[in-house]
């Protein structure tokens, strides 16, 4: 299940990311580990549709991170209307200090570094994909882009047509 909520704002921003952790994960132990890194967290119930319990905290660039162990499908059985992406590929951010974010995502969240380009661009992963997040040096924190996985080129063309019809800016 892929759920993305777009909210019109003055600037592009990714307000929250949610990551699935193994079903047997102990939130109390994760909270202690977060605290050992100076990160405050709290458990929340039903804060996000389909997620009964999450562990919520804020990363160094101000994005809320929610960890969840299990989820339930919240669809109503209707056919997907719109683009219908297969999955979220990755999210990219401009940040003043990519190394700080790479260390946080590595040490605190267990992400692995896939690649560095010099000292200004880092790719990190939490699964078999090359990267799930990347951080590019920039003057201020800013969401750069979101990438979705689509079926094929025809699916991409359909997505672009739909976004164009709705006058949705994609750059």
Model-predicted regions and their roles:
Residues 2, 16, 90, 131-133, ...:
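Histidine-centered active-site/metal-ligand motif
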Residues 1-2, 46-49, 93-131, 136:
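Core segments of cupin and vicinal oxygen chelate
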Residues 2-4, 62-66, 74, 130-134:
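Short, charged/polar, Gly/Pro-enriched secondary-structure boundary elements
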Residues 34, 62, 101, 105-106, ...:
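Conserved active-site tyrosine of GNAT-family acetyltransferases
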Residues 79-82, 132-143:
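Solvent-exposed, charged amphipathic helical/linker segments at domain boundaries
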Residues 76-94, 101:
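Glycine-rich adenosyl-nucleotide cofactor-binding module
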Residues 7-84, 87-96, 122, 139-171:
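Vicinal oxygen chelate
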């Amino acid at each position: 299940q892929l759920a993305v909520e777009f909210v019109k704002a003055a600037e592009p921003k990714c307000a929250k990311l949610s990551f699935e952790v193994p079903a047997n994960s102990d939130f109390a132990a994760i909270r202690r580990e977060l605290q050992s890194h100076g990160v405050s967290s709290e458990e929340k119930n039903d804060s996000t549709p389909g997620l009964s319990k999450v562990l919520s905290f804020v990363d160094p660039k101000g994005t809320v991170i929610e960890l969840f162990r299990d989820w339930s499908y919240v669809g109503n059985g209707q056919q997907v209307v719109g683009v219908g992406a297969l999955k979220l590929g990755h999210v990219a951010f401009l940040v003043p200090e990519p190394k700080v974010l790479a260390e946080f995502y590595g040490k605190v969240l267990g992400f692995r570094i896939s690649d560095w380009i010099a000292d200004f661009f880092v790719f990190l992963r939490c699964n078999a994909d090359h990267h799930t997040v990347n951080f590019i040096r920039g003057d201020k924190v800013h969401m750069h882009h979101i990438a979705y996985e689509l079926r094929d080129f025809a699916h991409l063309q359909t997505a672009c047509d739909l976004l164009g019809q709705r006058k949705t800016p994609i750059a």
